[in-house]
């Protein structure tokens, strides 16, 4: 039986880079749980429930489950019987931070391993922060996010 992975993030919003990481990781795992985390920003662009629902609507593979992340990531992983944490790396600059997180998670729960997948070249510059900035300034985000997410962001902007 293939293992279960947790793919954590704020996904505010879900980008094509996130989707690419999940699609490339699916052959490695029996199941991937996308753990949508609350954001530390006082005013998230999308509410947690909105993000969870959008992600679930975009990622329709039965091996993908989308849940709100509660508590410590390693505790969440144990609760859902996951033995891997999946992380995407866009650039070398991501590695230092992710490496520290991986070691901290290992200290908290050595039975849970962190797996890194590098972003494909076409996605290495895409970030939720940049997408939010483009939305705020009235730009077109359709090259960077799934069509469903682009439509949702456009509707929110028109309100």
From Swiss-Prot:
The record marks 18 as: Transition state stabilizer. Its cofactor is Mg(2+). Substrate binds at residues 10, 42, 73, 87. Pathway: Cofactor biosynthesis; coenzyme A biosynthesis; CoA from (R)-pantothenate: step 4/5. GO terms for biological process: coenzyme A biosynthetic process. One of its GO terms (cellular component) is cytoplasm. Coiled coil: none annotated. It comes from the Bacteria. It is an enzyme of class 2 (transferase). Its EC number is 2.7.7.3. ATP binds at residues 10-11, 18, 88-90, 98, 123-129. Pfam families: CTP_transf_like. The keyword Transferase applies. It catalyses: (R)-4'-phosphopantetheine + ATP + H(+) = 3'-dephospho-CoA + diphosphate. One of its GO terms (molecular function) is pantetheine-phosphate adenylyltransferase activity. It is found in: Cytoplasm. Keywords: ATP-binding, Coenzyme A biosynthesis, Cytoplasm, Magnesium, Nucleotide-binding, Nucleotidyltransferase, Transferase. HAMAP family: PPAT_bact. Homohexamer. Belongs to the bacterial CoaD family. Reversibly transfers an adenylyl group from ATP to 4'-phosphopantetheine, yielding dephospho-CoA (dPCoA) and pyrophosphate. This is Phosphopantetheine adenylyltransferase. The gene is coaD.
